């Protein structure tokens, strides 16, 4: 078993209401399965690790009440795909979204997130430790000039990484045993790291452009305007006037400062409000769609499912469950 699991995740799981469930082999004979105490929530958390090199995690659980997670993660590099999620990362603030590949660099700043009650967290991820990317890889490939930390940081969060999504699905669906399973997981971890490094090569950094204080203030005004008017169709030329920037500069500066496009920013605001309306009002799906800015409920349902992993009525059923 992985040292990071024994020393960090096991105490964290116990602290937050998980119970060791050694007889549960729904994800295969290898690894350890945990289940949430009925008083706290429901579902399972599966982990498999190899010494101090890496671990693999599969989540499928939900909490009965909104859950605040705050912890200092050990030094590591992780890559995860959420198939269902509802919540927000708080430092820095960003909405958690399903259907994307997300990386995280552990060991630098505390991780803080708010997870919404009753909405299932379904995810699969890989985590590698410094013993893997600073020692093991360099020992195997001493001539290679790679920086895994920069490569993982480059990805951050993207919906355009289909090969990684397929690999994580293969891990989630695998049910092997013994040495065959150990070799399978070891191979998939190496393949994932290879994909991350290749992704960095295919997406080289563009020359850095430092934002001026005036640019930052103008972007914050644009973001505030979008937050107040997210339900409307906002012409781009109005935003360029507000920002005192040309179209190209506005798009690039907004992406640089907020780490998302203007369209993605608006959609995140719409989905956050839609989640609230579905959970706490009796508005129909069509009424929710119109309230947050979509003319058809079918388009809204498609985007909502892409964002949370659930259809609107599925989300409401879970969120309003007592």
Predicted regions span which residues?
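Terminal helix-turn-helix DNA-binding modules in bacterial transcription factors
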Residues: 220, 224-228, 232-240, 256-298, ...
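Alpha-helical bundle regulatory/interaction domains
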Residues: 4, 89-214, 236, 241-247, ...
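Short hydrophobic/aromatic patch on the recognition helix
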Residues: 249-250, 254, 299-300, 304
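N-terminal functional module of multi-domain proteins
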Residues: 24-122
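Short Lys/Arg-enriched alpha/beta "domain-start" segment
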Residues: 1-30
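…primarily DNA-binding HTH/wHTH and HhH modules…
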Residues: 301-322
């Amino acid at each position: 078993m992985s040292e990071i699991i024994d020393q960090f995740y096991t105490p964290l799981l116990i602290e937050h209401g998980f119970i060791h469930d050694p007889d549960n082999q729904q994800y295969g004979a290898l690894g350890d399965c945990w289940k949430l105490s009925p008083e706290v929530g429901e579902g399972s958390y599966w982990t498999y690790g190899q010494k101090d090199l890496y671990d693999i995690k599969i989540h499928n659980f939900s909490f009965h009440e909104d859950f605040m997670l705050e912890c200092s993660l050990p030094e590591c590099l992780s890559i995860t795909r959420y198939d269902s999620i509802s919540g927000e990362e708080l430092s820095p603030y960003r909405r958690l979204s399903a259907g994307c590949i997300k990386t995280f660099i552990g060991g630098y700043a505390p991780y803080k997130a708010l997870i919404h009650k009753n909405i299932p967290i379904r995810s699969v991820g890989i985590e590698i430790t410094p013993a893997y990317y600073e020692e093991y890889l360099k020992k195997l490939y001493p001539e290679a000039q790679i920086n895994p930390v920069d490569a993982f940081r480059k990805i951050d969060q993207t919906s355009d990484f289909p090969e990684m999504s397929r690999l994580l699905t293969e891990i989630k669906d695998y049910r092997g045993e013994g040495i065959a399973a150990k070799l399978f997981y070891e191979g998939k971890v190496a393949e994932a790291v290879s994909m991350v490094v290749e992704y960095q090569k295919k997406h080289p950094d563009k020359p850095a452009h430092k934002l001026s204080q005036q640019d930052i203030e103008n972007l914050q005004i644009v973001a505030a305007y979008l937050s107040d008017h997210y339900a409307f169709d906002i012409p781009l030329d109005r935003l360029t006037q507000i920002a005192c920037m040309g179209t190209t500069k506005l798009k690039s500066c907004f992406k640089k400062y907020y780490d998302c496009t203007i369209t993605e920013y608006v959609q995140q605001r719409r989905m956050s409000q839609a989640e609230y309306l579905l959970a706490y009002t009796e508005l129909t799906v069509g009424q929710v769609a119109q309230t947050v800015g979509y003319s058809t409920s079918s388009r809204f349902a498609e985007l909502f499912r892409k964002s949370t992993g659930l259809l609107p009525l599925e989300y409401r059923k879970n969120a309003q469950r007592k």
